[in-house]
Curated annotation (Swiss-Prot):
PANTHER family: 2-DEHYDROPANTOATE 2-REDUCTASE, PROBABLE 2-DEHYDROPANTOATE 2-REDUCTASE. NADP(+) binds at G7, A8, G9, G10, V11, G12, N101, E267. GO terms for biological process: pantothenate biosynthetic process. Belongs to the ketopantoate reductase family. This is Uncharacterized oxidoreductase YkpB. Coiled coil: none annotated. NCBIfam families: apbA_panE (TIGR00745). It comes from Bacillus subtilis (strain 168). GO terms for molecular function: 2-dehydropantoate 2-reductase activity. One of its GO terms (cellular component) is cytoplasm. Transmembrane segments: none annotated.
Amino acid sequence: MKFLVVGAGGVGGYIGGRLSEKGNDVTFLVRQKRAEQLKKTGLVIHSEKGNVSFQPELISAGETGQFDVVIIASKAYSLGQVIEDVKPFIHQESVIIPFLNGYRHYEQLFAAFSKEQVLGGLCFIESALDNKGEIHHTSASHRFVFGEWNGERTERIRALEEAFSGVKAEVIISGHIEKDIWKKYLFIAAQAGITTLFQRPLGPILATEAGRHTAQTLIGEICTVLRKEGVPADPALEEESFRTMTSMSYHMKSSMLRDMENGQTTEGDHLHGFLIEKAKRLSLAAPVLETVYANLQMYEAEK
């Protein structure tokens, strides 16, 4: 089984590195600058779960080759170009596993490929590149979840399970992947929304009554949109999402807030813009969500 990992950053570099560490056939599709960096230093992972350092197999857009599994771990705003880049590497039986936040990317992938080729996927990990291009895994979690949309343990799922077996990461085959995706989407959109709106970590926000109320209102607005879309986002899910938020570190910053602090492009359109589009189409009022998105739009316009 030949793997193509699109992106060698905090997520793609990590899971691709773990697959390679086990002895799987893994190639990374990267841009020229990242390729030059990797050729010079190798792919390096610093993690309490075990460090990794090796010279990875690399390929660039425009080259030829066929791969059985394509793992997409790029930023959502790059997906249009990623789709064009990977098309030549995909054969009829290839399977695509995206590890992106949100849901909009599935609509793009289903339109570009057959839905049967795209598995549902998500991950829970805090990892990022330093200025030398080395990956630092800084969370206890390094969980990667994927599965068939109908929950079946198909032949290809069993083959993937074998390939991931023994990898130094928590890999879960889900029988309800769509539910898992929406659950994470709710939490990520709320966490990123509230921290970017107030430009603070979670702790100081949730330490105030007004901050807690705003966070709960945002979660409620997102759940209302999801319910109207047919997603089972009941009050128990709202409570669980807020409870998870309150259990996190006082100094916890969303990755989107860190992107803003570093002057980088955010996934605001992909996460919050997508929800706003649905709210408008459904004639739903979502004032906090709209304020979150307006703040992100102003940031993108000014950076």
